[in-house]
């Protein structure tokens, strides 16, 4: 039994379907959107090897033809050269404005293929079929698309909403444990930023979910997507509440840049570490009790995910250099860096009133613990 979360955006509203077996039935679910019985799939090598046959079988069952472009896996793919490769491919395939592209992969593919759809012929529709936990609960929903720049993450892109999202819970069983736990950083973030009862639910059910319980996985994805859908409906282009979804990301993006967007630090791992740092900073500023960052770290430890700078292998820059990297964050307004801090678990807020000295002291202490 699948769940459906509606992202209410007027004429551009769409459904996020969550459940088992959705790839096998993808053709029937996508068919009503098509102007002609053909789709163009953008994916990556790992996903193609694991799941392309199932997707093609699902499309064939609905008499939908398909072409596919298979890219290398990894964060480095979210770049100008691969965006140009997709753009050239869509043009060579004569993809029309009424056609649909399928983004079939994790967050990298969703962001990249979505951006290509946004700029091809000034915008065509696309469907997200996210294959990682991180993509299912976060990046596939809300219309943020884009690529990384040498100066920072996600600095080039567009808001372009999908027409449909199919989150197949079955594919989560094929993830490596590290990839699943990286995505879990985004799940826990939702509880931390605005839903204390959900965080309590995760404390009770997270370990069993990580071990593979499908019902718990579906419920965790549903609750995460529902929270994101509600926030996106209120603030699609991040002028207000949507910035709350960046809890942990100011630290995370600096750490990702410092590690060269490599597998030294996966995005969801950076989010988990960033959330722990944000709560620690909040406690130091007297905004929440010290019990809150301790509880956050205890839960991340119970899940076995990364939670401290000491969990990142290799060298890191000093505190000043990390703060400089934070200055490239998209949340900078009038030259001022905005942080998402918390008055407690489930009570995040956005502020620019953060002393740089406090951030430097926090990072200096965290680096000293490595």
Curated annotation (Swiss-Prot):
Pathway of action: Metabolic intermediate biosynthesis; chorismate biosynthesis; chorismate from D-erythrose 4-phosphate and phosphoenolpyruvate: step 2/7
InterPro entries: Dehydroquinate_synthase (IPR050071), DHQ_synth_AroB (IPR016037), DHQ_synth_fam (IPR030963), DHQS/DOIS_N (IPR030960), DHQS_C (IPR056179)
Cofactor(s) essential for the protein: Co(2+); Zn(2+); NAD(+)
Record GO terms (molecular function): 3-dehydroquinate synthase activity; metal ion binding; nucleotide binding
GO biological process: amino acid biosynthetic process; aromatic amino acid family biosynthetic process; chorismate biosynthetic process
Record EC number: 4.2.3.4
Cellular component GO terms, alphabetical: cytoplasm
Top EC class for this record: lyase
Binding site for NAD(+): 107-111, 131-132, 144, 153
Signal peptide: none
Keyword Amino-acid biosynthesis: yes
Catalyzed chemical reaction(s): 7-phospho-2-dehydro-3-deoxy-D-arabino-heptonate = 3-dehydroquinate + phosphate
Function recorded in the entry: Catalyzes the conversion of 3-deoxy-D-arabino-heptulosonate 7-phosphate (DAHP) to dehydroquinate (DHQ).
UniProt cross-references to PANTHER family, sorted A to Z: 3-DEHYDROQUINATE SYNTHASE, 3-DEHYDROQUINATE SYNTHASE, CHLOROPLASTIC
UniProt family annotation: Belongs to the sugar phosphate cyclases superfamily. Dehydroquinate synthase family.
Protein name: 3-dehydroquinate synthase
Organism: Jannaschia sp. (strain CCS1)
Protein's gene: aroB
């Amino acid at each position: 039994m699948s769940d459906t979360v509606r992202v209410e955006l007027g004429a551009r509203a769409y459904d996020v379907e969550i459940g088992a077996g959705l790839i096998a039935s993808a053709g029937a679910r996508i068919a009503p959107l098509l102007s002609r019985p053909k789709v163009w799939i953008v994916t990556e090598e790992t996903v193609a090897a694991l799941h392309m046959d199932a997707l093609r079988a699902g499309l064939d069952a609905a008499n939908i033809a398909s072409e596919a472009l298979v890219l290398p896996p990894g964060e480095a793919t979210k770049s100008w050269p691969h965006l140009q490769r997709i753009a050239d491919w869509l043009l060579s395939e004569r993809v029309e404005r009424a056609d649909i592209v399928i983004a079939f992969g994790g967050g990298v593919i969703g962001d990249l293929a979505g951006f290509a759809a946004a700029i091809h012929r000034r915008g065509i529709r696309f469907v997200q079929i996210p294959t990682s936990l991180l993509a299912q609960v976060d990046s596939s929903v809300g219309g943020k698309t884009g690529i990384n720049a040498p100066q920072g993450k996600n600095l080039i892109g567009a808001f372009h909403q999908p027409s449909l999202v199919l989150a197949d819970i079955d594919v989560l069983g094929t993830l490596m444990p590290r990839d699943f736990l990286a995505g879990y950083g985004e799940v826990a973030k939702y509880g931390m930023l605005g839903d204390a009862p959900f965080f309590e639910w995760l404390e009770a059910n997270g370990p069993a979910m990580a071990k593979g319980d499908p019902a718990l996985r579906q419920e965790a994805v549903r609750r995460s997507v529902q929270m994101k859908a509600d926030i996106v409906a209120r603030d699609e282009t991040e002028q207000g509440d949507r910035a709350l979804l960046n809890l942990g990301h100011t630290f995370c993006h600096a750490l990702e840049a410092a590690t060269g967007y490599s597998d030294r630090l996966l995005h969801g791992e950076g989010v988990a570490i960033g959330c722990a740092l944000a709560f620690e900073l909040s406690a130091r500023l007297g905004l929440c009790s010290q019990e809150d960052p301790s509880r956050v770290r205890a839960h991340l430890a119970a899940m076995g995910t990364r939670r401290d700078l000491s969990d990142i292998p290799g060298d890191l820059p000093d505190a000043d250099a990390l703060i400089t990297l934070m200055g490239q964050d998209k949340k900078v307004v009038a030259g001022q860096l905005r942080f998402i801090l918390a008055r407690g678990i489930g009570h995040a807020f956005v502020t620019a009133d953060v002393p740089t000295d406090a951030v430097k002291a926090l990072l200096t202490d965290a680096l000293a613990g490595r």
